[in-house]
């Protein structure tokens, strides 16, 4: 996946914010998506993505499957966050996931550095007690990271829990 243009991230941020706010009012997710779709800029690709999300949601009941299939538009990390919220065995709430996605999209609109992106995503894993292995695998696929970063992230994924995060961060200096 390549990085999207700024306007796409701005619209994604609005989309996730609107979903979060309207779900709090107990509106059905498909209905909310249909209404929000009409509010999104038609010059972006998000309305098409919303159509696909709605179709997959009505077919399988899961939004994360569509996000994974739309890997050219949504990052693996975004799909992972939604999949974690959809996991019936987990404790991660969809409303929290939508907040995470909103902040992620708004953050990406500012063209953040790889360091900032990593720490935002890693903090999301830690604060919400999400699966480190699956989460770091998703982070590895982020278009923000180049080959050196991917090598370091692979190392982190293998060593997390065995080595303190501070030592892993210090190892980054040598890349």
Where in this protein do the model-derived segments appear?
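Catalytic metal-binding core of the metallo-beta-lactamase
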Residues: 1-173
């Amino acid at each position: 996946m390549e990085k999207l243009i700024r306007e796409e991230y701005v619209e994604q941020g609005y989309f996730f914010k609107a979903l979060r706010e309207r779900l709090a009012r107990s509106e059905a997710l498909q209905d909310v998506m249909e209404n929000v779709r009409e509010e999104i800029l038609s010059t972006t690709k998000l309305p098409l993505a919303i159509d696909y999300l709605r179709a997959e949601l009505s077919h399988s009941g899961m939004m994360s499957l569509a996000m994974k299939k739309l890997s050219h538009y949504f990052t693996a990390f975004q799909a992972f966050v939604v999949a974690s919220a959809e996991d019936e065995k987990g404790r991660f709430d969809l409303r929290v996931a939508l907040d995470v996605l909103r902040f992620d999209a708004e953050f990406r609109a500012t063209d953040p550095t790889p360091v900032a992106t990593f720490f935002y995503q890693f903090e999301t894993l830690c604060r919400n007690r999400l699966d480190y292995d699956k989460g770091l695998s998703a982070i590895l696929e982020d278009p923000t990271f180049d080959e050196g970063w991917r090598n370091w992230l692979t190392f982190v994924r293998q060593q997390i829990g065995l080595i303190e995060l501070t030592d892993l961060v210090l190892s980054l200096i040598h890349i």
